[in-house]
């Protein structure tokens, strides 16, 4: 069983809301303070939590009080009054903090994603980003604290809902910005995040919150198949028409096939040399296609043709379309988005009398609950040994299966 978490963001997401939801789930505030102290910036802030109510519902509000500015009270992501730091400086702070390995890795990834987005907005390299949004003390505490909390809970996979756009404008270090702010839009663009308008005309998603969600979440949209064990509620600062609470569901995966979103590209061709088809296949696989195949079809004027079908991740649609337009004679491509169920796939090695062979094992569940559905030796490994020893491919294939069954 995998431990799953699902970020439900009806009123958006911010770093302090993430911390609040984690503390609400049981992450000790003392644990966070203890490990955050390793960053060497604990003189710049005070971290504490309290129970609050939002539209009648109770949640946990985490405060990051900046001691460098005693008048600071709204903790808004864009109004930092703490030291500005470059990305390399923050990376060094994190590496030197002796954090748990997962928390360190996640923290570095979140900051790099945030710097990538901010750099793209301002037209500079990520490592040269030097302004409030990345360097502020509360952003560091929010991001590293969230990663510490997720690690403390033992989360294996994080998922996230669609995000509300919000509206209006917000004051930032670079002036007055429209909501959603440019960095948030760029982060959404990088992960193709589904968004919607919930009618609330305020900033609902901050760059820090967006960076955490877009970096650490496996998928966006509806919740994964899971048994919900507990829900943590992290309170935002503003009073909104609906409860301003980030809801973090904690649970275990259920024994059902995993779901993933894929894109299907299709085009009909009747005037391309058959010799080119093989090259098109290779080019599509090189840019990230998951599968490519053709079907024989009849076309206009009774001409025989092919239906070229490409299955790829949603973020590979553009590059796959470019290959198809460049390498074929088609004038148009159909694009479908579908969901597919997949089994867990693992690669194991087995030893035969002629050498080692990789074996792909398809299963569902883990440990005592694991159920194996299919075992297949890798074609290329079998072919290489068959050629090397001048024996039939099927013999190597059979020996590999026998080795797996006897392992």
Curated annotation (Swiss-Prot):
Keywords: Nickel. Pfam families: Ni_insertion (PF01969). Signal peptide: none annotated. It comes from Gloeothece citriformis (strain PCC 7424). Belongs to the LarC family. It comes from the Bacteria. The keyword Cell division does not apply. This is Putative nickel insertion protein. The keyword Protein transport does not apply. GO terms for molecular function: lyase activity; nickel cation binding.
